[in-house]
Amino acid sequence: MHQFEEELTCSICYSLFEDPRVLPCSHTFCRSCLEGVIQLSSNFSIWRPLRVPLKCPNCRSIVEIPASGTESLPINFALKAIIEKYRQEDHSDVATCSEHYRQPLNVYCLLDKKLVCGHCLTIGKHNGHPIDDLHSAYLKEKESSGKILEQLTDKHWSDVCLLIEKLKEQKAQCESIVQDDKKVVVQYFKKLSETLEHKKQVLLAALDEINRQILEEYEPHIEKLKKIREEQLELMSLNTSIQKEESPLVFLEKVDNVHQRIKALKEKELPDVKPVEVYPRVGHLLKDVWSKTEIGQINKILTPKIKLVPKRKLHSKNSEKERGKPEELLQAANPLSVTFIFTVIIAIAVLSFHKPISSVVIESIPTHISDFFGFLYQDFCTCMQNTVDVVCHKLNSLAEFLGGIVPF
């Protein structure tokens, strides 16, 4: 607090003097503060004298206050004038209370550890709290600054530093793990994408090849029939022109020529068109095999050899509906094919165990036998898948039945 401001502060309320009155001992106090002291003293007195004795709060000397009270005490006009002038001046360097207008913060509250004004102590929320003057509080806190430094440099803060380093290390480890996992994910899906792209190109190449075979199969027949059709149209046009011929000799010669050409044209052998189909169907393969294969096993799926084969006859008109029934699918399985394939697999396994089969032997197998095995393999896979579906369906039905009887 400014030294000049301290001289203008009441020692009872620690605020700027309000209506300053002078005691006989020459000490000045606020009139309201003196009335409070007199009221407190009169509460302990059993009689009311003509003059009220009062102990000065500063010098502790006994002074007498007239019976009329503090109103009869002289006003310190000089001090009052100085205070009024002081209040009119700008004191931006002096801290003032935020709750009490223009009251300086000139007292230190020991309970709340903060600066307060005189009104805070008398009528505010700090009333009755232990206090100290600013200079004394400053000296005490200055002496305890060493303890503050000790509190800020004890083992607790070393533990905080160690914990920070430990957390940073754990954070770095976790981030490293995440980065490694990211690399694994990228590599995994890159490899998976390459595998799928390779399988895609292989299947598309196989379909392009079968498309070429389709052209070779049908295009010659179509061209041959087109020529026959063109010759037919030519003969029809020739016949129309002959009908306009008026010379009997010329007409007969031309008609005979037309008959011979028609006979020769009709005697030409027409191509024997047998219904064929593409087998196996890639769409069915993707649906029945690929969609049920684990991702990691896709690279192990064999690419089928797509061919044009004679179209198989349907056993009934509702064969497509019957294929959807698990029981009839199971009955449709060819026991002879399954037995034959199992026998071949066992024989190959025995021969491989006894003596590895050389690549020369494998390559010496005729092409038609290899195709036959491929055809049987596709049928076998389809039959086995149908069998598994039926078994799973039966097991699920049994589990639902038992679940309704015996609670799990």
Swiss-Prot record:
<keyword id="KW-0472">Membrane</keyword>
<comment type="subunit">
    <text>Interacts with ECSIT.</text>
</comment>
<keyword id="KW-0812">Transmembrane</keyword>
<dbReference type="GO" id="GO:0008270">
    <property type="term" value="F:zinc ion binding"/>
</dbReference>
<feature type="binding site">
    <location>
        <position position="100"/>
    </location>
    <ligand>
        <name>Zn(2+)</name>
    </ligand>
</feature>
<dbReference type="InterPro" id="IPR001841">
    <property type="entry name" value="Znf_RING"/>
</dbReference>
<keyword id="KW-0863">Zinc-finger</keyword>
<keyword id="KW-0175">Coiled coil</keyword>
<feature type="zinc finger region" description="B box-type">
    <location>
        <begin position="92"/>
        <end position="134"/>
    </location>
</feature>
<dbReference type="Pfam" id="PF00643">
    <property type="entry name" value="zf-B_box"/>
</dbReference>
<keyword id="KW-0479">Metal-binding</keyword>
<dbReference type="GO" id="GO:0061630">
    <property type="term" value="F:ubiquitin protein ligase activity"/>
</dbReference>
<keyword id="KW-1133">Transmembrane helix</keyword>
<dbReference type="GO" id="GO:0043124">
    <property type="term" value="P:negative regulation of canonical NF-kappaB signal transduction"/>
</dbReference>
<feature type="binding site">
    <location>
        <position position="97"/>
    </location>
    <ligand>
        <name>Zn(2+)</name>
    </ligand>
</feature>
<feature type="coiled-coil region">
    <location>
        <begin position="163"/>
        <end position="247"/>
    </location>
</feature>
<feature type="binding site">
    <location>
        <position position="120"/>
    </location>
    <ligand>
        <name>Zn(2+)</name>
    </ligand>
</feature>
<protein>
    <recommendedName>
        <fullName>Tripartite motif-containing protein 59</fullName>
    </recommendedName>
</protein>
<feature type="transmembrane region" description="Helical">
    <location>
        <begin position="333"/>
        <end position="353"/>
    </location>
</feature>
<dbReference type="Pfam" id="PF13445">
    <property type="entry name" value="zf-RING_UBOX"/>
</dbReference>
<dbReference type="GO" id="GO:0005789">
    <property type="term" value="C:endoplasmic reticulum membrane"/>
</dbReference>
<feature type="binding site">
    <location>
        <position position="126"/>
    </location>
    <ligand>
        <name>Zn(2+)</name>
    </ligand>
</feature>
<dbReference type="InterPro" id="IPR000315">
    <property type="entry name" value="Znf_B-box"/>
</dbReference>
<dbReference type="InterPro" id="IPR017907">
    <property type="entry name" value="Znf_RING_CS"/>
</dbReference>
<dbReference type="InterPro" id="IPR013083">
    <property type="entry name" value="Znf_RING/FYVE/PHD"/>
</dbReference>
<dbReference type="GO" id="GO:0045087">
    <property type="term" value="P:innate immune response"/>
</dbReference>
<comment type="similarity">
    <text>Belongs to the TRIM/RBCC family.</text>
</comment>
<keyword id="KW-0862">Zinc</keyword>
<feature type="zinc finger region" description="RING-type">
    <location>
        <begin position="10"/>
        <end position="60"/>
    </location>
</feature>
<comment type="function">
    <text>May serve as a multifunctional regulator for innate immune signaling pathways.</text>
</comment>
<keyword id="KW-0256">Endoplasmic reticulum</keyword>
<dbReference type="GO" id="GO:0005783">
    <property type="term" value="C:endoplasmic reticulum"/>
</dbReference>
<dbReference type="InterPro" id="IPR027370">
    <property type="entry name" value="Znf-RING_euk"/>
</dbReference>
